[in-house]
Amino acid sequence: MNSVIIINGSPRKDGNTAKMCRAFAEGVKLQLQDATVETVNLYDFDFKGCRSCFACKLKGSKNYGHCSVKDSIMPILEKAAQADILVFGSPIFLIDISAQMKAFLERLIFQFATYEAGYKTIAPKRCNVATIYTMNVPKEMFPETIVANIESFIGHVFNQPKRICAFNTYQFSDYSKYAVEVFDEESKRKYRDCIFPVELEAAFNMGMKMAENIE
């Protein structure tokens, strides 16, 4: 049975990132009805990023190629490593992915990215990967260089990710309650009503396409 693991790196379980992840999952399920699709909300877990202990690089060790830190995120790291499709969804905070997503990727990727010749990867599966980003800024302000950097590491260990974005997101249910002068609520609402559904459809279609091409 095919396994799809979707990692939601947003603190919101029903926000824009979660909705994009959900749309992707629905696309997968339509194409692969017997697939196991699991969504993981990182903010439900108490964990930290890489501790630089280098246990995963120790010659002859049983931990070689495996993160040795035993905490609540460990079972998720193990599931992710065996997935057929991996999805990393994150809001953009301060021109970067969320801290929780960064910490998770440190733990997941570094254990498999060896210092052997050619920086050999020892991931148990070269799974297909998608990245989903949501942000409250327009497309021209998307931090392409920053996300491309982390995607290069993901691509080295697994496969180069397929990227899906949602821009100019609607942040608050009631803008009148917040001090917001740099965004126009009406234009944000129009974007949400007209464009966000198109972005959700793109996530849905990507889920279908990746499920169709699963090996």
Q: Which role fits each region the language model picked out?
A:
Residues G49-C53, P143-E144, S173-Y178:
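Short aromatic-enriched loop/helix-cap "lid" or pocket-rim segments at secondary-structure transitions
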